[in-house]
Amino acid sequence: MKMKNFLSKSLLVLLIGLIGVKSADLSDCFSSRSTWYEAIQHGNCGYEQLTGKLGPGNLMIAAAATALYNGSFACGECYEIYGPGGTGKVMIVDQCPDPGWCDTPFPHLDLSPTAFNTTIGSTVGVAMTTVKKVSCDVTGNIKAYMKDAATTNTWFEFMVFNHRVGIASISVEDSKGTITSLPRRLYNYWTYNGNAASFPVIAHVYSIYGDQVDIYLTSSAGAQLYEGVGQFADPATTFADDCTAPFPVDTDGYIYDNGLVKPLNYNHPNLGWSDWSNGVTVNWADSSTPGADSTSKVVASGTLAYNTGIQIGTDLPVEWEGRFTALEFYIKADKDFTGLVVEYNGASKSQTPSLTTTWTKYTYDLTKDLGAPASLGKPAALKFRNNGSGSVKVYLDKIRLTPVASS
């Protein structure tokens, strides 16, 4: 065993690792989706209690979908999440098992309640987010924990944790100089299973960027905690720190255009506009009448009895000031009608357009005409409500929030 080399290499990495503790960006921004779960302790990565001796020391954690978990190689890595409620950093401590959410190639993260409330809020159960991989804000050296089991010098397992970046591989070198590469298990332990190892041994821990930190293991006895001589350094990267949370609706303002609009064609929960209608069945793909212009293949229609209406909403906050100025739409009816009210839930004003049997475009200033609330997301909803006498069939097309640049 080359103790001199062991100490010199490890001390070098220790000094490099102490130069800075701020996270480094380790990937470009990418689209993700997040849910939340409550059973956050004792996750698949083996950290047991999150605030215990093996855990990250806080509850800002996530369980990664199969594609991200990568057979436990994601354990201990960190991601910064940009959501509709804010930004937060999480460590991967578990694998997300839910079919449909977590077993697809899409990068899904199941968050702790703390992380979900920080980045998304408490009013929804799922949301789209923007994510990037970052180095972890851990302090101190890399650590190892010998499994609490009947370990021997021919079979032992240990977990390595408290690392700033991901681990690529581990090998052990015994006191006779024999080096053995170890496999990583799905439960995040590294296994030695072979000829009797001559203790003490050195665990050579290699990062995904090629750094090496060594951990001196004195015996195969289980439930022992060890500290390495060093910490991985942040790699030099050129990734831009320009992530933003996905805007929950179409940034060009379209609410209805041949269907209720989903931004960027993401057909995921909470993104885009949905049918929140009250007491009326809306045909969102009515092809029985020509649309307002040549690009219209279908329109929206519904027969409104008294005090029922077509309602359109979205779950996530839509803070419109500085982005949109007005609501515009085309409307007609099966007869002349003056009892329709256009309004938002929680708004201070409403409008009553006069309907005819031909398409008419209306544009209402969100502030002056509609007194729109600061957010057009839940609980606000756009309503086309019958406040007149008798029923009326209403047709709608090209519903849009007018962007500032277009006003």
UniProtKB/Swiss-Prot annotation:
Concerning PROSITE patterns, the annotation shows: EXPANSIN_EG45
> Could you tell me where this protein is found in the cell?
Secreted
Cysteines joined through disulfide linkages: 45-75, 78-136
* Top-level taxon of origin: Eukaryota
Q: Where is the signal peptide?
A: 1-23
The Expansin-like EG45 domain is annotated at 42-141
Q: Which GO terms describe its cellular component?
A: extracellular region
Q: What is its main location?
A: secreted
- Locate the coiled-coil region(s) and give their ranges: none
UniProt keywords (A-Z) are: Disulfide bond, Glycoprotein, Secreted, Signal
Which residues are reported to be glycosylated?
A: 70, 117, 387
Q: Which PANTHER family match?
A: EXPANSIN-LIKE PROTEIN 2, PTHR31836
Q: What does this protein do?
A: Unlikely to encode with a protein with expansin activity.
Give the family, as the similarity comment puts it: Belongs to the expansin family. Expansin A subfamily.
What is this protein's name? Expansin-like protein 2
* Gene that encodes it: expl2
